[in-house]
């Protein structure tokens, strides 16, 4: 267990930027704005569920 934990910590210390952010290849650089918004899209569906329930009076 300790070995796995230390391996994870070591890898995240060696490659800190690759954990959360990755650069797109140059051919897809024009898609950067879309890729930046993509993680937020599921939240829109979550909010849409509340709007829908409000529209039907939370039946």
From Swiss-Prot:
Which InterPro entries did the record assign? PSII_PsbK, PSII_PsbK_sf
SUPFAM superfamilies this protein is in?
A: Photosystem II reaction center protein K, PsbK
Q: Which GO terms describe its biological process?
A: photosynthesis
Q: Where in the cell is it found?
A: Plastid, Chloroplast thylakoid membrane
Q: Where does it mainly reside? A: plastid
A single Gene Ontology CC annotation of this entry is: chloroplast thylakoid membrane
Keyword Transmembrane helix applies: yes
Q: Which residues form the propeptide?
A: 1-22
What membrane topology does this protein have?
A: Single-pass membrane protein
State the Pfam families in the record.
Answer: PsbK
Keywords linked to the UniProt accession: Chloroplast, Membrane, Photosynthesis, Photosystem II, Plastid, Reaction center, Thylakoid, Transmembrane, Transmembrane helix
Q: Which domain of life is it from?
A: Eukaryota
Record keyword Transmembrane helix present = yes
Q: Where are the transmembrane segments?
A: 38-58
Q: Which family does it belong to?
A: Belongs to the PsbK family.
Assembly, in brief, is: PSII is composed of 1 copy each of membrane proteins PsbA, PsbB, PsbC, PsbD, PsbE, PsbF, PsbH, PsbI, PsbJ, PsbK, PsbL, PsbM, PsbT, PsbX, PsbY, PsbZ, Psb30/Ycf12, at least 3 peripheral proteins of the oxygen-evolving complex and a large number of cofactors. It forms dimeric complexes.
The UniProt function text for this chain reads: One of the components of the core complex of photosystem II (PSII). PSII is a light-driven water:plastoquinone oxidoreductase that uses light energy to abstract electrons from H(2)O, generating O(2) and a proton gradient subsequently used for ATP formation. It consists of a core antenna complex that captures photons, and an electron transfer chain that converts photonic excitation into a charge separation.
Instruction: Name the chain's protein.
Output: Photosystem II reaction center protein K
């Amino acid at each position: 267990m300790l070995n796995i934990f230390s391996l994870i910590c070591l890898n995240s210390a060696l490659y800190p930027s690759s954990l959360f952010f990755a650069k797109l290849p140059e051919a897809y650089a024009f898609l950067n704005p879309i890729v930046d918004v993509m993680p937020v899209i599921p939240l829109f569906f979550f909010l849409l569920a509340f709007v829908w329930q409000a529209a039907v009076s939370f039946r």
